[in-house]
Design a protein with these regions (language model features):
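Adenine nucleotide-associated cytosolic modules
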Residues: 2-349
Length: 349
């Protein structure tokens, strides 16, 4: 393991104001420099997490995201600029590029992949804290089960419209996500960024609380954790701190050790993407894609462009973005059956 190396002067100069803060001091700053944090999702929340932790001097940031930058992201996803959207850079890559400009002395490890049962445990390996930057409960349950299994602290967060929520999970010390939310909200029962939109202030607020909790965990200030479910509505000026009690002994995850989200899935999966008229198709077994060969095969059927990270194919009203691991985002439909049909027709089974 390579540990970032800093002189006393460099540390004191860059982080001088942070070191003055009583909760950090020099000892806390050195703990931050030696820490590794996993950020799952690098959209609105995740990019805010990444920038704050990078500037704070967390020594190693592992950033995972399955998507690429689009113009509609720029309103609230602070790590990205117009040229990232024009180039259709993967969010993890664009964030890593920006972070290296912000702080060249920390280690950035970007992963362009879909987080699932097959890779989550490898991704959290060696990490001190996991930060939630996702937009769906299935991935959060995955994070929860993996973190509970490996006793890794993680910080849940969500934001939609002007409302946000966050909670810190310390396995077997606090309730886990399944203790509080036994099941995901039924489809169409709760607002999403598709239906309610989202404003940037709630993103900043939720991320600020999540990052602050992370700093407390990394520096050992665990008695200062808020130990609650924090809820905010910045438009309605509402702030609530809901007691979460103690872990549920009958919880499938932290009580009974039944990590359902980590069980293998033998078939192709499809997921509706928040905020877009799009479906993600993931093959049951990731396969390396030769973009040049695929482009030659697809050109007679439509417009094809590719770079080292992804291939974009337009045909009629549809657009398929194919990643190196054979995942594809099918845009122009909200019907899973249609997306699967297009994937099978143009990419293969």
């Amino acid at each position: 393991v390579i540990v970032p190396c800093y002189t006393e002067t460099a540390v004191d100069d860059r982080y001088s104001r942070q070191i003055l803060f009583n909760g950090i001091r020099e000892e806390g700053q050195r703990k931050l420099l030696a820490a590794r944090v996993l950020i799952v999702g690098c959209g609105a929340l995740g990019s805010a997490h990444a920038e704050a932790l990078g500037r704070a001097g967390v020594g190693r940031l592992r950033i995972v995201d399955r998507d690429f930058v689009e113009p509609s992201n720029l309103q609230r996803q602070t790590m990205f600029i117009e040229s990232d959207a024009e180039k259709r850079l993967p969010k993890a890559i664009a964030a890593a590029n920006r972070l290296r400009d912000i702080n060249s002395e920390i280690e950035i490890e970007p992963h362009v992949t879909d987080v699932n049962y097959s890779n989550i445990e490898q991704l959290i390996d060696g990490c001190d804290v996991v930060l939630d930057g996702t937009d769906n409960f299935s991935t959060r349950y995955l994070i929860n089960d993996a973190c509970v299994k490996h006793e890794t602290d993680w910080v849940y967060g969500a934001a939609v419209g002007s409302y946000g929520v966050t909670m810190t999970v310390r396995p077997h010390q606090t309730p886990c996500l399944r203790c509080i939310f036994e099941e995901a909200p039924p489809a169409a029962s709760a607002p999403t960024c598709d239906t309610a939109g989202v404003i940037m202030p709630i993103i900043n607020l939720v991320s600020a609380v999540q990052v602050t909790e992370t700093l407390k965990l990394l520096t050992g200030n665990t008695t200062d954790l808020h130990q609650s479910l924090m809820q905010f509505d910045v438009w309605r000026n509402e702030w609530r701190k809901v007691s979460i009690g103690v872990p549920n002994p009958d919880c499938p995850s932290c009580g009974l050790g039944q990590y359902e989200s980590l069980e293998p899935i033998s078939s192709e999966t499809a997921a509706v993407l928040c905020g877009r008229d799009a479906i993600q198709i993931s093959p049951s077994q990731p396969t390396s894609i030769d973009f040049r060969s695929l482009a030659e095969r697809l050109r007679p059927s439509g417009d094809v462009k590719f770079n080292e990270y992804l291939l974009r194919f337009k045909t009629g009203p549809f657009e398929l973005t194919v990643f190196q691991d054979a995942r594809s985002i099918v845009r122009g439909t909200d019907q899973i059956a249609t997306a699967r049909s297009l994937y099978a027709k143009y990419i293969g089974n």
